């Protein structure tokens, strides 16, 4: 199969171990239809093609510890970067700002002066945290524009791909809508343990910040119970991390 320019740009950063999965998906009718819809768009695709599969550029499938699901990318071209909740913008999006506040509440040692680098979440991505949007693209300035375009089937097949290799990371759903979207639209979550937590958006009120149950510590406790190395949740690499704080 001759790959078109759009697909080549999409997979330009993908690690070979993930390419094995994606190269099988691109042969399927649903993915060919998805590519045609993306190519037919007159408006800008968010994120840009080179970043759509960026989530698959940091570690091998076998090293996937946790999947934190978002719904779809930030619709602003200055924010979307291919990682759910992360941003390339120097201004921290509201949801990410609350994620950082929650993190500092659970780990006071991580409290630091604001830095534009905190928005990237690269330290998480480099430790086996798959920051995965249920829908990987949208149209500039329009939320949820590519629902039912095929990304749901892609992510359903992704979970099958992991499960078939006996890779069963913890699935983390932030918000009821995200959980319902993943369970109903993507499906195939049987066999995976999962954790549900309020959404960090200000539209959800203060539930994310005031929830008495820990989020990040719960994830690390799960990893310890499964004999895996815990995540250093520092949002900026090399920041001090005291797991007991």
UniProtKB/Swiss-Prot annotation:
Instruction: Quote the SUPFAM superfamilies the UniProt record gives.
Output: Uracil-DNA glycosylase-like
- A Gene Ontology molecular function term of the record: uracil DNA N-glycosylase activity
Keyword field: Cytoplasm, DNA damage, DNA repair, Hydrolase
- Biological process per Gene Ontology, one example term: base-excision repair, AP site formation via deaminated base removal
A Gene Ontology CC term for this entry? cytoplasm
Reactions it catalyzes: Hydrolyzes single-stranded DNA or mismatched double-stranded DNA and polynucleotides, releasing free uracil
Gene3D superfamilies, sorted: Uracil-DNA glycosylase-like domain
Q: Where are the transmembrane segments?
A: none
Read off the CDD domains from this record: UDG-F1-like
Q: Which residues are annotated as active site? A: 72
Record EC number: 3.2.2.27
Assign the protein's first listed, main location to one coarse class: cytoplasm
HAMAP family attached here?
Answer: UDG
The entry's family comment says:
Belongs to the uracil-DNA glycosylase (UDG) superfamily. UNG family.
Give a short account of what the protein does: Excises uracil residues from the DNA which can arise as a result of misincorporation of dUMP residues by DNA polymerase or due to deamination of cytosine.
Q: What is this protein called?
A: Uracil-DNA glycosylase
Name the source organism: Mycoplasma genitalium (strain ATCC 33530 / DSM 19775 / NCTC 10195 / G37)
Name of the gene this protein is made from: ung
């Amino acid at each position: 199969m001759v790959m078109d320019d759009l697909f080549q740009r999409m997979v330009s950063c993908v690690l070979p171990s993930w390419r094995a999965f994606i190269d099988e998906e691109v042969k399927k009718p649903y993915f060919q239809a998805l590519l045609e819809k993306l190519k037919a768009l007159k408006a800008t695709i968010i994120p840009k093609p080179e970043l759509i599969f960026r989530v698959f550029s940091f570690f091998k499938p076998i090293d996937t510890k946790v999947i934190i699901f978002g719904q779809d990318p930030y619709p602003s071209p200055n924010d979307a970067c291919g990682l759910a909740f992360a941003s390339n913008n120097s201004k921290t999006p509201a949801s990410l700002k609350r994620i950082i506040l929650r993190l500092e509440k659970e780990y006071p040692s991580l409290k630091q002066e604001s830095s534009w680098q905190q928005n990237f979440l690269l330290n998480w991505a480099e430790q086996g945290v798959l920051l995965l949007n249920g829908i990987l693209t949208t149209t500039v300035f329009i939320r949820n524009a590519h629902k039912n375009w095929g990304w749901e089937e892609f992510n359903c097949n992704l979970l099958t791909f992991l499960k078939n290799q006996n890779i069963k990371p913890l699935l983390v759903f932030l918000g009821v809508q995200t959980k319902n979207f993943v369970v109903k639209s993507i499906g195939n979550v049987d066999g995976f343990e999962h954790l549900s937590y309020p959404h960090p958006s200000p539209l959800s009120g203060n539930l994310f910040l005031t929830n008495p149950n820990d989020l990040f510590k719960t994830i690390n406790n799960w990893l310890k119970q499964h004999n895996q190395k815990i995540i250093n949740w520092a949002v900026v690499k090399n920041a001090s991390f005291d797991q007991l704080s």
